Regions:
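Carbohydrate-interacting regions of secretory-pathway proteins
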Residues: 1-140
Length: 140
């Protein structure tokens, strides 16, 4: 989940039996892990490390629109807030009861709001033939 909530635009939450790898700092005690594009990929999965804070808060001031971009291509994903990459993710998958990982390569997009008012405008979906060059280096 690409969280859309005031104060937490771009955070990640695992849903159901999902798992994913995110460039993030290692956990420190009970503190949540924080995304950082210069860190190695670390696994997040339901029931364990299931939440990751975005790298920084790039939200717009109150009463201004915040632009959100979610780029997904070939097992790689980016959470972008107002033009700033706040999370680098790869290998989204779900885990079967027998422990087998199944890649998530397609599915549905859901926009939602939990316990807070949110407005959407200019929602667009664009097919990609490749990961935009400016972001490809984040996966090296």
């Amino acid at each position: 989940e690409f969280q859309i909530m005031e104060g937490h635009m771009g955070d990640f939450w695992c849903q159901s039996t999902s798992a994913i790898d995110i460039r993030s700092y290692p956990a420190e005690g009970v503190m949540n892990r924080v995304a950082n594009a210069k860190q190695p990929f670390r696994t997040f999965r339901s029931g364990q490390e299931y939440f990751c804070l975005r790298s920084e808060n790039y939200e717009s001031p109150d009463n201004e629109w915040t632009r959100l971009d979610l780029i997904c291509f070939d097992g790689k994903s980016l959470h972008i807030v107002n033009g700033h990459v706040v999370m680098v993710l790869k290998d989204s998958r779900y885990i079967l009861p027998d422990g087998k990982a199944v890649p998530m390569k397609s599915g549905k997009i859901q926009l939602q709001s939990e316990a807070a008012e949110v407005f959407y405008r200019d929602v667009r979906i664009k097919a990609l033939t490749e990961l935009p060059e400016e972001y490809a280096r984040l996966f090296d």
